[in-house]
Structures are given as C-alpha cells and as structure tokens.
From Swiss-Prot:
InterPro entries: RNA_pol_sigma_r3/r4-like, UPF0122, UPF0122_fam_protein, WH-like_DNA-bd_sf
Family membership noted in the UniProt record: Belongs to the UPF0122 family.
PANTHER family: UPF0122 PROTEIN CBO2450/CLC_2298, UPF0122 PROTEIN YLXM
Xref: SUPFAM superfamilies: Sigma3 and sigma4 domains of RNA polymerase sigma factors
Organism: Streptococcus pyogenes serotype M3 (strain ATCC BAA-595 / MGAS315)
Function: Might take part in the signal recognition particle (SRP) pathway. This is inferred from the conservation of its genetic proximity to ftsY/ffh. May be a regulatory protein.
Name of the protein in its database record: UPF0122 protein SpyM3_0842
C-alpha cells in the first residue's frame, strides 16, 4: 500500500467513525470490511453473494456520500482543529489544572460514542 492509499484509508475510516449512523446497513458493512478489516472486493462479494463490481460500485458511491457529509457538516475537520487547539493549550499551559480539567472534559465529549 502506498502513502496515498494509506491516507485515503485513514480518511475513510475517520469519516466512517463520524457518519456511519447515516449510512445504510449494506454501506456500513461494505465500508467497514473494505477499509477497517482490509477485506478484498472478492472477499466482500463472496460474503454477501454479489459480484465484485457490485461491491466496488457500492464502495465508490459510499465514499462520495461520506465526503458529501463532511463537506456539509464538517464534523471530522472541526474535530481535527479542536484537537490541535487542545494540544496547543496543553503544551502552553501544562501547570494550569483548571484548564487541563476543562480540556479533558471537552475531549471526552468529542470521543464519546
């Protein structure tokens, strides 16, 4: 796997974490198997009794759907920005217990399921 493929896989996994609840069961299954579990198109096709082309088409459509959700809702990009701000605040104010506690609370809100 080259760097571009790894970056795409990481992005799809991140978008999936944020938007999985908005997908159909089939879309969730295919994306999770393909990106998170590293199944091949053939393995997914065998698992669901469909053609490789059907799996490929569904995955490509779902990738576009996930990107569209992100373009409209910005949940992932906002999370990344918040995380960077929190990291910066922690680095600049390591002895401020009140601030550390509030950052911890905000981080736990971001990471809840």
């Amino acid at each position: 796997m080259n760097i571009m493929e790894i970056e795409k896989t990481n992005r799809m996994n991140a978008l999936f974490e944020f938007y999985a609840a908005l997908l159909t069961d089939k879309q969730m299954n295919y994306i999770e198997l393909y990106y998170a579990d590293d199944y091949s198109l053939a393995e997914i096709a065998d698992e669901f009794g469909v053609s490789r082309q059907a799996v490929y088409d569904n995955i490509k459509r779902t990738e576009k759907i996930l990107e569209t959700y992100e373009m409209k809702l910005h949940m992932y990009s906002d999370y990344v920005v918040r995380s960077e701000i929190f990291d910066d605040m922690i680095a600049h104010y390591p002895h401020d217990e009140y601030l550390q506690e509030k950052i911890s609370i905000l981080t736990s809100i971001d990471n809840r399921e």
